[in-house]
Amino acid sequence: MSDPQKKHFALADTPFDTGTLRAGLLDDRVGGYASFEGWVRDHNEGRTVRGLRYEAYVALAEAEGERVLGEALAKFDILDAHCVHRIGDLAIGELAVWVGVSAAHRDAAFAACRFIIDEVKQRVPIWKHEQYADGDAGWLHPDRPQNS
C-alpha cells in the first residue's frame, strides 16, 4: 500500500486521518482549500446496503490515480492536491474517499477538487462490492454510470 503522506494519490486498507492530510496541503501561500469526503451510505438504487468492499488492481490504480492528480496540478491554478481511497471491507458511515486541494484562490480549489473526484471515479480501477440487507450482493464497476 502507498503511504498517503508521500504521494498525491494513495490507497489505504485502514482508516486514515484527514486532519493530517489537510495539514500537509496548507502553507502561507494558500488562500483557499477545498475537500470532498465520500462516505459509505446505507442505501443505493432503492436497496438497503449493510456494508461494502472495495477492491483494486493496486499498481494500476495507484499509477492512474497519480496521473489524475498530475493532470489536476497542470490544468488548474492550484498549489497541491491529494486523494486517498479506501480498499477492503467498510461499514456504513466509514470514510471511503477523500480529496483535498489547496490554491491561492477558492475557485481553482473547488474546480480541481470536483475534477479529481470525477476522474478518479471514472478512470481508476477500483471496484465496489455492495452487500445488501436482503442477503444479496453485487459488484458496481467504475465504467458503469452511478447516480451522484
Report residues per predicted region.
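Short hydrophobic/aromatic beta-strand micro-patches
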Residues: 100-102
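N-terminal, polar/charged subdomain of small-to-medium soluble alpha/beta proteins
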Residues: 1-95, 104-114, 118-148
